[in-house]
Amino acid sequence: MKVLLLTGLGALFFAYYWDDNFDPASLQGARVLLTGASAGVGEELAYHYARLGSHLVLTAHTEALLQKVVGNCRKLGAPKVFYIAADMASPEAPESVVQFALDKLGGLDYLVLNHIGGVPAGTRARTPQATRWLMQVNFLSYVQLTSRALPSLTDSKGSLVVVSSLLGRVPTSFSTPYSAAKFALDSFFGSLRRELDVQDVNVAITMCVLGLRDRASAAEAVRGVTRVKAAPGPKAALAVIRGGATRAAGVFYPWRFHLLCLLRRWLPRPRAWFIRQDLNVTAAAAA
């Protein structure tokens, strides 16, 4: 019975992803602020938006990497592309980034929140200061960016696209503070969606649940701890863009993560078993 149930759910998810009414032309001329744009999924998001003719403001921590991405976006046909280097660990950075984007683009149609800050898997934030840093980068900066951009998104009937993680839906071992920040994101934006709805504010919120990021820093952080393979950056980025453009409530990539999230509620014991299979417990505990 369980196998039949999972098979049926899988068929439904495939049908959904193949029929999402995505119109690439809807992104031509769209004004997009993208964070975490210098590498991995964020870099691929920038390239997809550039190909689709969006106007871009890109931000990340490292200016040299941003400059490379900006140059590539221009080659791919982005009509406008600007960048601002910013450290989201600084409480002042989010507001200055949004103001820069508003000044350059005259408003926003999409705010795509993708930046992350973490610690190596298997370690814990061993001090209150380290935990505060994690929460500032992975949660509070998202709140600040959203609060500052929301008036413009309200005017444009725009979209908030939040790139999160499976760790924000399903608790797992050896990622306590990072997972806490991701759960906070899910709760905050879920509540905000309800508030906007009851106030008849036409701003969509798309929560994107992705797997391991396809970038060197992510691979190094989980080396020896997890057996999970990174999701291909271009494919994950395209799933995020499709979800945002169609104003979907949620995106799961790979799609099986949706099943794992459902297992959390319906079948907690199998869910725990699946998670354990992906962990090298000995290596993580020794970290």
From Swiss-Prot:
- Name its species: Macaca fascicularis
Which SUPFAM superfamilies does the record cross-reference, listed alphabetically?
Answer: NAD(P)-binding Rossmann-fold domains (SSF51735)
Write down the chemical reaction(s) this protein catalyses: cortisone + NADPH + H(+) = cortisol + NADP(+)
Q: Which UniProt keywords apply?
A: NADP, Oxidoreductase, Secreted, Signal
Instruction: Check the record and name the Gene3D superfamilies matching this protein.
Output: NAD(P)-binding Rossmann-like Domain (3.40.50.720)
**EC annotation?**
1.1.1.-
Where do the annotations place NADP(+) binding?
36-62, 87-88, 114-116, 178-182, 211-217
Q: What is this protein called?
A: Hydroxysteroid 11-beta-dehydrogenase 1-like protein
Which residues participate directly in catalysis?
A: 178
Q: Could you state a single Gene Ontology molecular function term? A: oxidoreductase activity
Indicate the family of this protein: Belongs to the short-chain dehydrogenases/reductases (SDR) family.
Q: Where in the cell is it found?
A: Secreted
